[in-house]
A protein has these predicted regions:
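Flexible beta->alpha loop and helix N-cap segments adjacent to enzyme active/binding sites
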Residues: 5-16, 87-89, 95-139, 355
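Conserved thiamine diphosphate
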Residues: 34-49, 104-119, 126-142, 214-216, ...
Length: 447
């Protein structure tokens, strides 16, 4: 039964505070599994997204894995509204005060915005590395400080390695920089400079401490929906993926412009009713993943949390570890689909089982090992395609309004899905040499 807030507020506040004070597991374990990832603190919580939103679980998971060192460029759309609306934001910090650095620019330039963030971070870290090299080259620099500086230089591009080395370097700097010079020949200058030592080692050490936020390797992410990635921001996204920068793009694909009310985008497949497609969309879905794969050096994955969490974890961890651009396209059930949002994860699972949303990973590192870089992770459809789409109002409403048109479009959509899966299957069965030759032939054919 309903009770007044006043009657339970004090007790529940105490329970909440108790939960916040619980210690984190003080044990080293592999975080990159479905089960173990959930022992990590989410740094995205209590967003104002629609109940059952298919987008937010992906963001929560990414912040659990990389949130304490990640930087996010967020395209305008649903994810920027629930991600950064005043007076509160869902992005938080851990007990050490570390959390995602988040910013939103415009709808149309988000990829470039994230690209610029990464370029700036790369340049600043290169300058910091130069400073550390100068510091440990100072003849009278403390031996322990030199060792800590060298360890950081050796591990600066490794996520966990840079974290451990950074802690050591900061501790040594705090112990060595600006010592008490009372009673020494340098006392007068030391006092005149506000008790700051002006020697070369201390000057360089202070510069390193002033930029200590850069010691841990950053994880650069670019978030956005399909309206941004497939349509309005596609030119910028393509430009960024064509570069060699280590950025990770997460596309939250709802197959419509969700934030503005459900307009059709190039991610909308053949058949459903949407704004600007009131009689059913007559053209197919853009294959953003295959377009990115054509470069040959972009990591690409198509994922669905509700269908295969293990494949999702593999895709996220492989993408983040890949030294280059990566693109993850995530199926996100939306209230605009006309479904029971209390069962959005089950709906996502049905999409994969019906062959509506195939799962795959394209890892260029495999090609370097002489292996096929393309892995098809989903099996052939085991449920009826049309039964699945008729469970969503966006499709069922077309059948009700224009039965003949619906039959025609749904037949075409089912055939397109079957052909797409067969194409992916053939790609997955090729050896590395055959795959390379096929991609080269397709590239020439498109010239």
């Amino acid at each position: 039964t309903m009770t007044s807030l006043a009657s339970c507020e004090e007790a529940e506040n105490a329970n909440w505070n108790f939960c916040l004070e619980l210690p984190d597991p003080d044990v080293e374990f592999n975080h990159n599994t479905v089960k173990n990832s959930q022992f990590l603190q989410p740094l995205f919580e209590f967003s104002g997204a629609c109940a059952g939103c298919g987008e937010t679980p992906y963001i929560k998971l990414v912040t659990q894995l990389y949130g304490d060192r990640m930087m996010i460029a967020n395209a305008t759309g649903c994810s920027s509204i629930y991600g950064g609306s005043a007076p509160t934001v869902p992005y938080s910090v851990n007990k050490k005060g570390f959390g995602p650095a988040w910013a939103n620019s415009l709808f149309e330039d988000n990829a470039e915005f994230g690209f610029g963030m990464n370029l700036a971070t790369t340049q600043r870290r290169a300058k910091l590395a130069d400073t550390v090299e100068k510091l440990i080259a100072v003849e009278y620099c403390d031996a322990d400080l030199k060792a800590a500086g060298k360890e950081w230089l050796d591990n600066m591009d490794d996520a966990e390695g840079s974290r451990k080395a950074a802690d050591k370097l900061i501790a040594e700097l705090n112990a060595s920089v600006d010592p008490d010079l009372t009673g020494t020949p340098y006392e007068k200058d030391w006092l005149a400079n506000g008790k700051k030592c002006v020697c070369e080692a201390c000057t360089l050490g202070r510069e390193v401490l002033a930029n200590k936020d850069l010691l841990v390797k950053k994880s650069q992410w670019i978030f956005g929906g399909d309206g941004w990635a497939y349509d309005i921001g596609y030119g910028g996204l393509d430009h960024v993926l064509a570069q060699d920068q280590d950025v990770n793009v997460l596309v939250l694909d709802t197959e419509v412009y969700s934030n503005t009310g459900g307009q059709a985008s190039k991610a909308t497949p053949t058949g459903p009713i949407a704004k600007f497609a009131a009689a059913g969309k007559r053209t197919g879905k853009k294959d953003l993943g295959m377009m990115a794969m054509s470069y040959g050096y972009v990591y690409v994955a198509k994922v669905c949390m509700g269908a295969d969490k293990n494949q999702l974890m593999k895709a996220i961890t492989e993408a983040e570890a890949y030294k280059g651009p990566s693109l993850i396209i995530a199926y996100a059930p939306c209230i605009n689909h006309g479904i029971n949002m209390g069962k959005s994860q089950e709906e996502a699972k049905k999409a994969v089982e019906a062959g509506y949303w195939p799962l795959y990973r394209y890892n260029p590192d495999l090609a370097k090992e002489g292996k096929n870089p393309f892995t098809l992770d989903s099996k052939p459809a085991k449920t009826d395609y049309k039964d699945f789409i008729m469970g969503e109002v966006r499709y069922a409403s077309l059948k009700k309004l224009f039965p003949a048109v619906a039959d025609q479009l749904f037949d075409r959509a089912e055939k397109e899905a079957e052909n797409k899966y067969e194409y992916y299957k053939k790609l997955s069965e090729l050896d590395s040499v055959s795959y390379t030759h096929l991609r080269a032939h397709e590239t020439r054919s498109n010239l």
